[in-house]
Amino acid sequence: MKSWTAAAVAAVCVALLTSDARPVKTTSGLVSGAAGRNTAITVFKGIPFAAPPVGPRRWRAPEPAPPWDGVRKADAFSPSCIQTIVTEKKPWTYEFMTHGEVSEDCLYLNVWTPATSSTDRRPVFVYIYGGGNVEGSGSIPAYDGEGLASKGLV
């Protein structure tokens, strides 16, 4: 199961690295991103990389993301996995804590890429946040990939 998940993540990243504002094709369907704070960057937020782990899929090996029809708008972060809500009494830095919606349906990835199309192959940087299934999220501002993408490195 790990190999198909890695392959799906890689396929989505490769497809998006060659994109501009036009929708791009992934293994599950078309997605459209949005301009980043730096308009030379396109950001794709909330792309599913597996089927939602709810109901009978709860605590089971992940299954491929179901395909969708049309163009999926990928311009907003997805919910974080279920975890403790942020409080001021936690001993760690506030900006590393989840602030938004939480849900069991939380298997999504975000991609930052230069906004112009390119046929050049680029390295892909995959960052999986920690948290031990207790905390963390791909929407935490400290994990924003725009800085790396704006340097043209990934």
Q: Where do the language-model regions lie?
A:
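Classical eukaryotic N-terminal signal peptides for Sec-dependent ER targeting/secretion
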Residues: 1-11
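Non-catalytic accessory segments of hydrolases
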Residues: 3, 16-154
